[in-house]
């Protein structure tokens, strides 16, 4: 079957960004006076967006208050702006795959739960931004993945029927 477009998840699919996230979480937890988390814990918290990551890092016996969440999210944003892409690794075979898809003429996009302020900067820092025609971040649509809205939005921008799009993600 031939597809007219292909969309890719970012974290955990094309890039291993856990070390970036872990460093930002470490610094955020330090800022707010919370106990540290292990890399394995942070890895298990990733995938539902920044606010969920921060909340999971803060939650021990009781969930954080709204004030604690606000302070922690602001701290995380500050630190992640600095660590975003610093330790990230492109998974083996990803660049070769992107080159092949691009050469085939298929429209390509990124659909991620990562906030837009971090998505584009990360793609630039990793030298990957030129491969993509569309970027749908976690704050582009009202709903995040796994809701279909972000992928449907990418298809709409492409001008492609959803059944003609292939999504690759973890």
What are these regions (language model features)?
Residues 2-4, 78-110, 116-120, 148, ...:
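Short, acidic loop-to-helix structural element flanking the phosphoryl-transfer center
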Residues 7, 14, 90, 108-111, ...:
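Conserved SAM-binding loop
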Residues 48-82, 92-95, 100:
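A metal-dependent, Asp-based hydrolase signature
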Residues 22, 26, 39, 43, ...:
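An amphipathic alpha-helix signature
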Residues 1-44:
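Active-site neighborhood of HAD-like aspartate-dependent phosphohydrolases
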Residues 86-89, 115-168:
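Substrate-recognition "cap/lid" segment bordering the active-site pocket of phosphatases
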